[in-house]
Amino acid sequence: MNKLAIQDTYGERFQHCWGCGPKNDDGLHLKSYPAGEACICTFTPDKAYTGGVPQNLFGGMIAMLFDCHGTASAAYFKHRDKGLELTKDTVIGRFITAHLEIDFKKPVPMNSPVTIRATAEEIGERKVVVAMEMEAAEEVCAKAKMVAVAVKDNM
């Protein structure tokens, strides 16, 4: 797995997201890493993010994790598709969510790291379709499909 997080290659203007922005002092600082044909993100939920059912991660947080990891993965997949490598000097093109569909399979426990694996299903000129699975306690808890589009002034 690459040791350089995709989010750490965002341009200065795009580093303030609450979920994944490296420059948001109050944020979660999620990190997505290329790993072969996939991108991986691992997160251990804090008790503050439990939902209406105690000891389970709430759905909005699950959506945010898919959102941040999916757009970072889309940026990487497009970058790689251009034949480029991710380096400390990279300023990667930024993607945003156009559509996010989530299937909640089972509760996500709070006492276990969550791993999200993303793969590219389609890479177009400005659009990347990303498929994701969220695992916790060695079980798939949620699946998502995202359509991410490139921010025009950062490609």
Residue ranges and their predicted role:
Residues M1-E12, K106-M155:
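HotDog/MaoC-like acyl-thioester-processing domains
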Residues M1-P54:
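Non-catalytic linker/capping segments at the edges of enzyme domains
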Residues D26-H29, T97-E101, T115-R117, A131:
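Conserved beta-strand residues within beta-sheet cores
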Residues I40-F77:
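A conserved, well-ordered hydrophobic junction motif at loop->secondary-structure transitions
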Residues F43-P45, F104, A150:
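Hydrophobic residues in beta-strands and at strand termini
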Residues S73-T115:
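Hydrophobic beta-strand-centered segment that forms part of the acyl-chain substrate-binding groove
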